[in-house]
Amino acid sequence: MFAAAKVQGINNDGHQRSKRLKTGLKRASGGAIFTAFLGLSLALTSTAVHPEAIIADHRAVQAFERIPAFWLEKAKTMTIHYAHTSHGDQVWQGVSNLESQYPKYRFARRVDATEGLPPAEVPPALRMYDGNPPETYIEPNDYWEGESGKDRTRDVADTGHYHASMWAWCGQVSGASEAYIQGYLDTLYAFETEYPAMRFIYMTGHLDGGGSTGNLHLKNQQIRHYCSANNKVLFDFADIERYDPEGTDFLDLGADDECDYWIGGTKYNWADQWCAAHPGSDFCLSCACSHSRALNCNMKARAFWWMMARLAGWNGQAPSVPLPLILFD
């Protein structure tokens, strides 16, 4: 799934090649230099081609229990860079809550304005660095929008410490234009070509009550279509929010990020209703869940672990046959 790699420089070859490519493209001025770097760019791009899309949506929540033990252990050797604002808290809040229920889902997170993973643990834990120096509250222009933000993300990728990087929207998609979303897609693709040993994880924006005809849904569809057509990794934040654990769809009832929906001018909350109907369910274990209900965070945690198992090499099927894979030492 990943290009053959070792931490601290990707065998001192692949990672350093991508780092030199970035520097060279910025400084190249002659035709021969540009041609040489262009050839290297194409070579690196070819190594970043993946056989299928990985879409972590509400179906991943339902498939979470089917993660084979072998691939769960592989997922716990993974490292991820995560950047976000408050809505993005929901992912790590749910993952931490899941670990409190079931310690086998070991998770370690370090949030700081300086780059760095939490220490390795024994037995292994999936490790996350939360931030994008010099900040931890990361808006578009701190990660992908504008050269300064892009370079901050590159600085983290340049360390060679991470299998993947993910950034979460807040409310920006609700008012976004098609061109704005395309700029986001193009930038993540550029990161992928510069760092072929990493996966850059795409994301949809949280629900806003606009239903299937609203701008948010249309722009989320733009992201989904791109990811499906180009074999990307997508954490489908909005899709997870529109379904309860049994698959009931609330999108066209005005579902929003708080799990509220409307019938006949009356507001309801599907998460509260579901938990009232399923007392004692693991999905309903209380936790801090920014802007939402614990059920929402708990579902996102399950989709996240499913996605990380897929990134570790699981083919999504059970029983699973281990695939050839070289992970970081």
What kind of feature is each model-predicted range?
Residues 48-69, 319-329:
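Boundary/junction segments of secreted and surface-exposed precursor proteins
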Residues 55-155, 310:
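N-terminal carbohydrate-binding/catalytic regions of secreted carbohydrate-active enzymes
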Residues 140-181:
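Oxyanion-hole/transition-state-stabilizing segment in secreted/luminal serine hydrolases
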Residues 255-319:
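Histidine-centered active-site loop/cap adjacent to the catalytic His
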